[in-house]
Amino acid sequence: MKFIVLLGALLALLVAVSADRIAREAPEMESVDEAVLTRQAREAEDPAVVEDAIRKFVRWLVQKYGINIHDLIDHFKH
């Protein structure tokens, strides 16, 4: 259960970082930001998109910090 909560939090973080990045790239285009956030909200409801985002984030964690995902899963199982 804790693992599912962690994955949900990671997904929310990914969406927030993406929206922030887009907002910094085009600050004068608020309607673009709203459209992107709407699209991301719709995609967040699609299980395949969520699963892909989680996989990408986990892959990034492993590459960036050398975190072993199996150790992380074992940590939250106990």
From Swiss-Prot:
GO cellular component: extracellular region
Cellular compartment(s): Secreted
Keywords for the protein's UniProt record, in alphabetical order: Secreted, Signal
Free-text tissue specificity from the UniProt record: Expressed by the venom gland.
Origin superkingdom: Eukaryota
Main location: secreted
Signal peptide: 1-19
Pro-piece positions: 20-42
Transmembrane segments: none
Keyword Disulfide bond attached: no
Keyword Translocase: no
Protein name, per record: Small venom protein 2
